[in-house]
Swiss-Prot record:
Name of the protein this chain belongs to: RNA-binding protein Hfq
Function: RNA chaperone that binds small regulatory RNA (sRNAs) and mRNAs to facilitate mRNA translational regulation in response to envelope stress, environmental stress and changes in metabolite concentrations. Also binds with high specificity to tRNAs.
NCBIfam families: Hfq, PRK00395.1
Gene name linked to the record: hfq
GO cellular component, one term: cytosol
Keywords for the protein's UniProt record, in alphabetical order: RNA-binding, Stress response
């Protein structure tokens, strides 16, 4: 795992596992809402009434609907599509 993913992957994985509703703002200003179904290095699958594949390079901000605690650094992160 590259250094750039040391925060991103555990954060997205926590949002996925806890099924936290999120708002995802794209760089063009569009707001998407739903739950993170899965993710990999390049995309996030966002589920609402339909599933959408959102490319990470198009994302500006991910806002959870409630505060989220990241797992401690002692635990290895699980893959996003587990």
């Amino acid at each position: 795992m590259s250094k750039g993913h040391s925060l991103q992957d555990p954060y997205l994985n926590t949002l996925r596992k806890e099924r936290v509703p999120v708002s995802i703002y794209l760089v063009n200003g569009i707001k998407l809402q739903g739950q993170i179904e899965s993710f990999d290095q390049f995309v996030i699958l966002l589920k609402n009434t339909v599933s959408q594949m959102v490319y990470k390079h198009a994302i500006s901000t991910v806002v959870p609907s409630r505060p989220v605690r990241l797992p401690s650094g002692d635990q290895p992160a699980e893959p996003g599509n587990a």
